[in-house]
A protein has these predicted regions:
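RNA-binding accessory domains that recognize and position tRNA/RNA substrates
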Residues: 2-199, 225-258, 262-267, 279, ...
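Catalytic beta-strand/loop cores that center a nucleophilic Ser/Cys/Thr
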Residues: 340-382
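Proline-centered loop/turn at the N-terminus of a beta-strand
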Residues: 118, 229, 301-303, 319, ...
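A glycine-centered loop/beta-turn motif at secondary-structure junctions
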Residues: 376-413
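Active-site-proximal beta-strand elements of phosphoester/diester hydrolases
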Residues: 229-234, 345-346, 385-389
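Residue-level structural signal for beta-strand termini and adjacent loop
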Residues: 29-31, 68, 348, 379, ...
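Intrinsic disorder/low-complexity segments
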Residues: 1, 195-227
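Cysteine-nucleophile active-site neighborhood
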Residues: 271, 275-352, 396-411
Length: 413
C-alpha cells in the first residue's frame, strides 16, 4: 500500500483505491470509469457475485471479494436481487475475462460497465482483507480512468469527508416508490424467471432500470386453497425473499419503507414482514419503529430478516451497534439454541443487536459461531420472530429456508 502523496498511477495502472487512512492501492480498472466513495468491506462467497452486487443492503459500500477469481460464470439477466446494482464497486484479485457457463449472456466487465459500477483488479485482496479485519471497515474512494491520471489528494479528501454508514438512513433510497403485489416463485431449470412481474415500473426504486431482470414465473402452490396475505415493508429487500414467501404459499404485497400503519392495515394483512436493507438501523428506526410497534399490538404474526431483525429489536427496546467489521459471506455457521442445530448461512450486515439489551419478553434464538453475536430472537408475548442471517440465500446455503414455512404456517394457524 502506497503513500497518498502519489498522484500518477504506476505504469499499467488504470484504477486506484484510496482509503481515508492515506493508504493508496493501485490496480487495473475494469467496468465503468469514474469514482465512488463509500465503506470498504469484504465478502467471502466463492460464487454469486451478481446477486451480491445487486443486493440493496450493499448500498454505500465497496466490496472486496476474497475469492481470487471473480467472473468465472459471466453474467446473465436472471441472477439479480434488485433491478439494478447497489454496491458502489468491487475489488478483485483477478477478473475472469473468458467466462464459461451455459447461462452467461456477457462478461462481468461488460455487466459492470452497463450499470455504471467500477471494478478494480490486480489487487492483493488478502492484504486488503487483513487490513479491514484488523483495522475495521474504512471509508474509501474507488476510481477508474483509462488515462491512468488521478488526483489522489482530492480522492483522499473525499474519503475522509464521507460521513460513514453510522447514523445514515439508506432504506429510503433503495425502497420501492409505491405499493405493489409481488407475483412469482423461484427459478426453475429450463424455465428461468419467465414472464413479467405484475407491478408498475414506477415501483422499481429510485434508480431502477427497465431491463426486466428478476422477472418471475407464476407461483404454483399445490394443495393450498388459502393464501395468507403478507404486507412486506421494503427497506431494501432482495427479490429471493419475496420469491420464497410466495413459494411457501403466501400472497405478498410490498410497501415502501416509509409506509404508515394505516397504509399497512388498508391492505388487510394476515401478517407482516420486515425486510433486509442498508444503513444504520437506528437511523431508519426513527420512522420504522413506531409502525412496527403498532404492528405488534395487533397480535398478528411478524417476521424480520437482517435490517428487519434489527428494527424489531429496536421496537421492543433493545439496542443495536456498529460492528468493528461486519459479517459478509455465504458460509457463516449459526447455532439454533432450541436444539443445538448448526445452520450454515448467508450473511451481510455491519450492525448487530446487543444481546444484553434484549427485554424480558424477548428470547434469543440464534447465535453466530464465529463471534457469538446475536443472530435471532422471538417474542414470548406475541407471534413475532426475526433472524440476522439470510434464509433466502442467493447466494448461499439453504439450511434456514424452513423459516419461510414457519412464518406462513403461523399465518395459517
Amino acid at each position: 500500500m502506497a503513500d497518498a502523496t502519489l498522484t500518477r498511477a504506476p505504469e499499467g495502472a488504470t484504477g486506484v483505491l484510496v482509503l481515508a487512512s492515506g493508504d493508496v492501492i493501485w490496480g487495473r480498472g475494469f467496468g465503468a470509469e469514474g469514482e465512488a466513495v463509500g465503506e470498504v468491506c469484504f465478502h467471502t462467497a466463492i460464487t454469486g457475485y451478481q446477486e451480491i452486487m445487486t443486493d440493496p443492503s450493499f448500498e454505500g459500500q465497496i466490496i472486496t471479494f476474497t475469492f481470487p477469481h471473480i467472473g468465472n460464470v459471466g453474467a446473465n439477466h436472471e441472477d439479480v436481487e434488485a433491478n439494478h446494482a447497489h454496491a458502489l464497486g468491487c475489488i478483485v484479485r483477478e477478473d475472469v475475462t473468458a467466462p464459461s457457463n451455459f447461462r452467461a449472456a456477457e462478461g462481468f466487465d461488460a455487466w459492470l460497465k452497463a450499470r455504471g459500477k467500477i471494478g478494480l483488479a490486480g489487487v492483493d485482496t488478502r492484504a486488503l482483507t487483513r487490513r479491514i479485519r484488523v483495522g475495521g471497515a474504512p471509508n474509501g474512494v474507488i476510481a477508474h480512468s483509462a488515462s491512468g491520471s488521478f488526483d489522489v489528494e482530492a480522492l483522499l479528501e473525499k474519503a475522509r469527508a464521507w460521513p460513514g454508514l453510522e447514523g445514515m438512513d439508506l432504506a429510503k433510497q433503495v425502497s420501492c416508490e409505491a405499493h405493489h403485489l409481488w407475483e412469482g416463485g423461484v427459478w426453475k431449470l429450463g424455465f428461468g424467471y419467465e414472464g413479467a412481474e405484475k407491478r408498475p415500473s414506477t415501483s422499481l426504486g429510485t434508480s431502477g432500470d427497465s431491463s426486466g431482470e428478476g422477472s418471475l414465473v407464476p407461483s404454483e402452490v399445490e394443495g393450498r386453497s388459502f393464501k395468507p396475505h403478507i404486507v412486506a415493508i421494503d427497506y431494501g429487500s432482495k427479490h429471493n425473499i419475496f420469491r420464497n414467501l410466495v413459494k411457501a404459499g403466501a400472497k405478498v404485497t410490498v410497501l415502501p419503507a416509509t409506509a404508515t400503519f394505516d397504509e399497512v392495515m388498508a391492505h388487510q394483512p394476515d401478517g407482516f414482514f420486515l425486510s433486509n436493507g442498508p444503513g444504520d438501523p437506528a437511523a431508519t428506526a426513527e420512522y420504522a419503529v413506531p409502525v412496527i410497534r403498532q404492528m405488534l399490538e395487533t397480535g398478528k404474526p411478524l417476521f424480520g430478516i437482517c435490517l428487519g431483525h434489527q428494527l424489531l429489536a429496536l421496537a421492543i427496546g433493545a439496542k443495536t451497534t456498529k460492528m468493528f467489521q461486519g459479517h459478509r459471506g455465504a458460509n457463516h455457521p449459526v447455532k439454533r439454541l432450541a436444539d443445538g442445530r448448526v445452520e450454515i448461512t448467508s450473511m451481510n450486515h455491519g450492525f448487530a443487536v446487543e444481546r444484553d439489551s434484549l427485554p424480558p419478553n424477548a428470547r434469543e434464538t440464534h447465535v453466530s459461531l464465529f463471534d457469538n453475536s446475536n443472530c435471532g430472537l422471538e417474542l414470548t408475548d406475541c407471534p413475532a420472530f426475526s433472524v440476522q442471517h439470510h434464509p433466502e440465500a442467493s447466494p448461499g446455503p439453504m439450511d434456514s429456508m424452513y423459516l419461510f414455512e414457519k412464518f406462513v404456517g403461523q399465518l395459517r394457524a
